[in-house]
């Protein structure tokens, strides 16, 4: 499928390590568009703002992220969310009645527990006086939960909020067909035998065909994998580059797992099964093995495969967010400040997965920072091709000028600072829970390495995106 982007993106910059070495021309910086100002450097010791509350992450946890169809397959989403909440309670010893509000993100709703935040909170033993609500924003659902918590605290409505997310891909709701649903509802309303027999006479075998959850984008009728394949082609990202990046993610995740850096994980005793203590999707392979896989979406010439895509994952995360004053009054040592954040949206057809490209310069400007000020980058890895396409877009003056209305590029993140403990490709991606994992990875990396600022960014279905600045809490 050829679009205007396919013909124009091939003109992007090649300064990224991952760019192709041929058939790409240099970019011009002479656009006459009315552009947004370039990011300006501001030297700051902290991003604290006068007369505004400092909002901190006290702690964040997640249960192990598992391949769907494995140890969590017989559970319900609220079981996973409850386990994450229980793990947070155990690690922080926060009195349950101190929590003012609970917010969880999720994408595919379990119909029996439409407000999974409330059901999980009750199951974890929180006070029945503590309100809870569930939010959905595709892959940035728990990001939305976190920033909603920030808003509640900043406005003075709350001092202590728990935010998190959950997804159970092992048991997604599968509905009867619409014709079957209509017949069943009508049968329930029928008052006489004659009415029931009349309705049953209209039954057809194809009524029994199930209605699966939508995989394609509603607005474009295109799957995200298909969009990733087109995006990779438009930005001239090769199959080899995608496989190399995926191997990097898995190798770094394995190293982080072995060295104990994934400290946000809390063990989960699965009822009737063993205790789960670590992610099970990390699978360092070889480029030779990865090259044997066939394209998963655009066949036979696509470049997106099972190996360079994130996998269906079950998991949950939870985070304790407080005003700094309240945290210190209760004797906690926070892990990080949650600073500026931004949400963006763009064309879901051709730019579905470019959320980080659009969000990054905006959040940097909001915070008065540049890419050079950032010590740790944590981006959601939906697909290798998505990450590498974002790198190229971020490193392109041409793209900045022609698609973003900016004078200059923001620049691509240096790999030595980027997702160095693995990412969604290797650790897994429970849609509703990934945002909290990203923020905790950023906070923990800053603490370990002595950095000051981290930048978290993610794309999401619908052509949306998010970015946030995380600032280390002084040791």
Swiss-Prot record:
Q: Which GO terms describe its cellular component?
A: endoplasmic reticulum; mitochondrial fatty acid beta-oxidation multienzyme complex; mitochondrial inner membrane; mitochondrial nucleoid; mitochondrial outer membrane; mitochondrion; nucleoplasm
Briefly state the modifications made to the protein after translation: Acetylation of Lys-202 is observed in liver mitochondria from fasted mice but not from fed mice.
- Presequence boundaries: 1-34
Where does it mainly reside?
mitochondrion
Name the top EC class: transferase
The superkingdom of the source organism is: Eukaryota
- What are the residue positions of the site described as Increases nucleophilicity of active site Cys? 429
- One of the protein's GO biological processes: cellular response to lipopolysaccharide
> Which GO terms label this protein's molecular function in UniProt?
acetyl-CoA C-acetyltransferase activity; acetyl-CoA C-acyltransferase activity; acetyl-CoA C-myristoyltransferase activity; lncRNA binding
Q: Which Gene3D superfamilies match?
A: 3.40.47.10
Intramembrane stretches (start-end): 174-221
Residues that the record marks as modified (N6-acetyllysine) are: 73, 189, 294, 299, 333, 349, 362
Keyword Zinc set for record: no
Catalytic reaction equation(s): an acyl-CoA + acetyl-CoA = a 3-oxoacyl-CoA + CoA; butanoyl-CoA + acetyl-CoA = 3-oxohexanoyl-CoA + CoA; hexanoyl-CoA + acetyl-CoA = 3-oxooctanoyl-CoA + CoA; octanoyl-CoA + acetyl-CoA = 3-oxodecanoyl-CoA + CoA
Keyword Mitochondrion included in the entry's annotation = yes
Q: Give EC number(s), comma-separated.
A: 2.3.1.155, 2.3.1.16
Residue numbers annotated as active site: 139, 459
Pfam families under this entry? Thiolase_C, Thiolase_N
- Where N6-succinyllysine occurs, the residues are 53, 73, 189, 191, 273, 292, 294, 333
Functional summary from the UniProt entry:
Mitochondrial trifunctional enzyme catalyzes the last three of the four reactions of the mitochondrial beta-oxidation pathway. The mitochondrial beta-oxidation pathway is the major energy-producing process in tissues and is performed through four consecutive reactions breaking down fatty acids into acetyl-CoA. Among the enzymes involved in this pathway, the trifunctional enzyme exhibits specificity for long-chain fatty acids.
User: Which family, according to the similarity comment?
Assistant: Belongs to the thiolase-like superfamily. Thiolase family.
Q: What is this protein called in UniProt?
A: Trifunctional enzyme subunit beta, mitochondrial
Organism equals: Mus musculus
């Amino acid at each position: 499928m050829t679009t205007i982007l396919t013909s124009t993106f091939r003109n992007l910059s090649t300064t990224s390590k991952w760019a192709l070495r041929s058939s790409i021309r240099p970019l011009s910086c002479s656009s006459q568009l009315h552009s947004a100002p370039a990011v300006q450097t501001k030297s700051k010791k902290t991003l604290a703002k006068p007369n505004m509350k400092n909002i901190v992450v006290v702690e964040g946890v997640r249960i192990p992220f598992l391949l769907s169809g494995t140890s969590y397959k017989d559970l319900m989403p609220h079981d996973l969310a409850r386990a994450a909440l229980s793990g947070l309670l155990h690690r922080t010893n926060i009195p349950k009645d101190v929590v003012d509000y609970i917010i969880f993100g999720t994408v595919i709703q379990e119909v029996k527990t439409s407000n999974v935040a409330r059901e999980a909170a009750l199951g974890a033993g929180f006070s029945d006086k503590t309100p809870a609500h569930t939010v959905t924003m595709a892959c940035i659902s728990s990001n939305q939960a976190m920033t909603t918590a920030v808003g509640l605290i900043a406005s003075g409505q709350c001092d202590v909020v728990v935010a998190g997310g959950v997804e159970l891909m092992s048991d997604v709701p599968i509905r009867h067909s619409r014709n079957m649903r209509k017949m069943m509802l009508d049968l329930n309303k029928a008052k006489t035998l004659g009415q029931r027999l009349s309705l049953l006479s209209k039954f057809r075998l194809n009524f029994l065909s199930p209605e699966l959850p939508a995989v394609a984008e509603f607005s474009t009728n295109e799957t995200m994998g298909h969009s990733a394949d087109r995006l990779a082609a438009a930005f001239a990202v090769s199959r080899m580059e995608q496989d190399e990046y995926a191997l990097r993610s898995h190798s770094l995740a394995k190293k982080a797992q072995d060295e104990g850096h994934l400290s946000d994980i809390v063990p989960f005793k699965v009822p009737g099964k063993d205790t789960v203590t670590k992610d099970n999707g990390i699978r360092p392979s070889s480029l030779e093995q990865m090259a044997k896989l066939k394209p998963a979406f655009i066949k036979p010439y696509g470049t997106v495969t099972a190996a360079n895509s994130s996998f269906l994952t079950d998991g949950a995360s939870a985070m304790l967010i407080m005003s700094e004053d309240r945290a210190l009054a209760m004797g906690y040592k926070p892990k990080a400040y949650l600073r500026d954040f931004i949400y963006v949206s763009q064309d879901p057809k051709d730019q579905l997965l470019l959320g980080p490209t659009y969000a990054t310069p905006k959040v940097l400007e909001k915070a008065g920072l540049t890419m050079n000020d950032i010590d740790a980058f944590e981006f959601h890895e939906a697909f290798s091709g998505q990450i590498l396409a974002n790198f190229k877009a971020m490193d392109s003056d041409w793209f900045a000028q022609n698609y973003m209305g900016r004078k200059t590029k923001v620049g691509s993140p240096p790999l030595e600072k980027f997702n160095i403990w693995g990412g969604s490709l290797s650790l897994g991606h429970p849609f509703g829970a990934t945002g909290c994992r990203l923020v905790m990875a950023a906070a923990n990396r800053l603490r370990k390495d002595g950095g000051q600022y981290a930048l978290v960014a993610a794309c999401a279905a619908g052509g949306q995106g998010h970015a946030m600045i995380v600032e280390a809490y002084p040791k």
